[in-house]
């Protein structure tokens, strides 16, 4: 459990709306990512969970897909990236520029609608490659009694998800390293790369 010292009732799960995730131009995406990373590092330095208003800033993080030019040493943002991202964050971020694209809200909502049509309303939900947790943030009210378990290999994205979805169980690491019991999940949902 992330920050076990914090009571469950004092935790906040961020709720996403489609308008919270517009398509952004690269410069805007970059600036929002940097703000979110600075805030994440501050929260970690202060050893605390994000407030509701801070979660809105963290939710602006959208990964590095489409931003490969920012990692070019001739780009004006290169030095800032090298300064803000520690070595354990920098290399995976650079390597993800061709693969880190998060699922659009319309797809997430359609997948949940399909689950509703199949009669699913509550249970243990697995999101095996959760990124920053967009599937968790779009969990419909009709499924709000469910418990979501997210797994994310990318440390930066997984740590963002832990701050955004404080009531859920987010594992930062490889799925093969998890210790979930057999037959524990009622449904798995996601858009694994």
Cite the ranges covered by each PLM segment:
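Class I S-adenosyl-L-methionine-dependent methyltransferase catalytic core
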Residues: 2-193
């Amino acid at each position: 459990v992330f920050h076990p010292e914090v009571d469950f009732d004092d935790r906040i799960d961020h709720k996403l709306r489609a308008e919270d995730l517009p398509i952004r131009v690269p410069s805007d995406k970059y600036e929002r990512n940097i703000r979110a990373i600075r805030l994440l590092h501050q929260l970690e330095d202060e050893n605390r969970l994000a407030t509701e208003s801070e979660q809105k800033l963290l939710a602006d993080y959208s990964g590095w897909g489409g931003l490969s030019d920012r990692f070019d040493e001739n780009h004006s943002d290169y030095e800032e990236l090298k300064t803000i991202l520690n070595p354990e964050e920098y290399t995976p971020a650079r390597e993800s520029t061709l693969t880190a694209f998060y699922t659009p809200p319309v797809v997430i909502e359609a997948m949940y609608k399909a689950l509703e049509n199949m009669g699913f309303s509550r249970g243990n939900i697995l999101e095996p490659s959760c990124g920053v947790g967009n599937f968790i943030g779009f969990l419909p009210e009709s499924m709000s009694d469910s418990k979501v378990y997210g797994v994310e290999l990318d440390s930066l994205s997984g740590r963002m998800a832990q701050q955004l979805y404080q009531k859920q169980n987010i594992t930062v690491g490889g799925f093969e390293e998890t210790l979930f019991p057999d037959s524990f999940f009622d449904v798995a949902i996601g858009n694994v790369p």
